[in-house]
Amino acid sequence: MANLKEIRDRIKSVKNTRKITEAMRLVAAAKVRRAQEQVLRSRPFADRLARILENLQSRMRFEDASSPLMEQRDVETITLVSVTGDRGLCGGYNANIIKRTEQRFAELTGKGFKVKLVLIGNKAIGYFTKRDYPVQATFSGLEQVPTADEANTISTDVLAEFIGAGTDRVELIFTKFINLVSCKPVVQTLLPLDPQDIADPEDEIFRLTTKDGRLTVEPGAGPANTEPKIPSDIVFEQTPEQLLNALLPLYLQNQLLRSLQESAASELASRMTAMNNASDNAKELAKTLTLDYNKARQAAITQEILEVAGGAAAVG
């Protein structure tokens, strides 16, 4: 059995580690609430914009319209946009996205497509650049709660690559935030856009309402498309191309912002859970070490008593 000093040092080290993990858990818990609220607040706008595009499609002949973001062409090159975090200590959050990106990369290259990567977050950047993957662009240092400016910077780069025919399809790989204890990596086609299939059937519908005199966001019930239909007698001054060129870039930027926000919320929730588990494990380990310390101390005392008794008997 280890000596008493070694056990005392280990107990002290474990308790100090627990203080750190507990502090990180509290920080993550405070930040995740803000990130969660940001995710919920952004959803009504995204939902409403998707419904507007759906209804416009039903009123106007978008299939005859021409927009760079809707251009369907033979797919030869595909860009994967992978969203991870800048830091670790968040359970399997980063590893799950990296694994899903590798799987998708292997699937596409196995079918003969040329694949390029756009990496968001230091974890993805560090992993893929060290393994000689074809990296098109990298972005890091995003805010804990991503902003529209950050999403616009990334979407502008991706959009320019698509319009310039540098890529034929763009897929987004990010972590969908479900709740504080559940999230999942998903793959979503970002470009080309299709107004006939603009809404994700798995998306919840969120509405901005008032409760007790305050604005709040609540999940909506009922059919997916709850947007009032556009009356058939309305005449639009703009052509379908003008409407699409105004709305689709906004929709693209919003989709990217939403994915960044959901990923950030998922990262913080994963970190909170990981630090909570680490704190619990440290507490249990400290208990076990304390028990070992007491046993070792008791054995040492017993040994000393036996030695004293043996010496007294020898003298007597």
Curated annotation (Swiss-Prot):
Keywords, comma-separated and alphabetical: ATP synthesis, CF(1), Hydrogen ion transport, Ion transport, Membrane, Thylakoid, Transport
Membrane protein topology class: Peripheral membrane protein
One term of GO molecular function: proton-transporting ATP synthase activity, rotational mechanism
Listed PROSITE patterns: ATPASE_GAMMA
Gene Ontology cellular component annotations, sorted alphabetically: plasma membrane-derived thylakoid membrane; proton-transporting ATP synthase complex
Signal peptide: none
Record InterPro entries: ATP_synth_F1_ATPase_gsu, ATP_synth_F1_gsu, ATP_synth_F1_gsu_CS
Subcellular location: Cellular thylakoid membrane
PANTHER family membership: ATP SYNTHASE GAMMA CHAIN, ATP SYNTHASE GAMMA CHAIN, CHLOROPLASTIC
Family of the protein in this entry: Belongs to the ATPase gamma chain family.
HAMAP family the record matches: ATP_synth_gamma_bact (MF_00815)
Oligomeric form and interacting partners: F-type ATPases have 2 components, CF(1) - the catalytic core - and CF(0) - the membrane proton channel. CF(1) has five subunits: alpha(3), beta(3), gamma(1), delta(1), epsilon(1). CF(0) has three main subunits: a, b and c.
Cited function: Produces ATP from ADP in the presence of a proton gradient across the membrane. The gamma chain is believed to be important in regulating ATPase activity and the flow of protons through the CF(0) complex.
Protein name: ATP synthase gamma chain
Organism of derivation: Parasynechococcus marenigrum (strain WH8102)
